[in-house]
Amino acid sequence: MYEHLGPLGGGPPNENHIALYSTWARGKWGIIITGNVQVSSSHLSLGADLVLPSMHGPYDIKPWATLAAAMHAASPGDTPSLALMQLNHTGRQSPRFVGGRAPWNAPLAPSSKRVGSNLNESFISRMMYWLLFHEPRIMTEEDIDTAVAQFCFGAKIAKEAGFDGVQLHGSHGCEFHHLSNLSTKPPQISSPSSCHQRCVITLLITVETHAE
């Protein structure tokens, strides 16, 4: 899910997010999950994302703690919902113009396959894909290590803010999915011969995130 409630360029939760999730908190839901919280500020989806602070400097936990509290704010007498933060790296689906990078800078992805490049579409559709999405820059091992660290840092932020857990966004198109996908995995990772090998990075992110 994507709320489109942040400023252009993304940022922490604001009063619009608090109002939305406070309303949902009174709905007697068992679990409430945030929209995708981007672990990389240079890989946004539609430009107004929730974005984690940098791993490499001081940060303000208050906006995230306020969001967690809002998600737990059930009506009197009701059991509070569990609050999960959904962590995401948009990868190759981060668009040219509102993706958090200069329009000429390509996003990082496990392979150089551009969004829409393997579809049998009309000429106009192919041109639209070309206009909206760059051919990605293939991730190095260092880039992969950074992505793992970013997910783990997100888990740390979630725990510190008072969330009950995290959800790792693994749907089609996003980095977490592509890292273990046979057709879009990084070329430096040997061809998987078993389910365990295909999911080695997924498992690494999961284990390291759980450790946080």
Summary of predicted features, one role per range:
Residues 63, 67, 140-143, 147-150, ...:
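General structural feature for long, well-ordered alpha-helical segments within catalytic domains
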Residues 1-4, 37-44, 172-173, 180-185, ...:
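Short connector loops/turns at beta-strand edges and beta->alpha or beta->beta junctions
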Residues 49-81, 179-212:
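Alpha-helix-loop-beta-strand connector modules within alpha/beta enzyme cores
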Residues 72, 80-82, 88-157, 161:
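Non-globular sequence segments
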Residues 94-100, 177-181, 199:
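Short acidic, glycine/serine/threonine-rich loops at helix termini
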Residues 1-90, 97-99, 136, 147, ...:
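N-terminal capping/small domains of soluble enzymes
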Residues 14, 54, 134-144, 148, ...:
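Active-site oxyanion-binding pockets that recognize sulfate/phosphate
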Residues 32-36, 80-87, 161-175, 212:
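Short beta-strand segments at enzyme active-site cores
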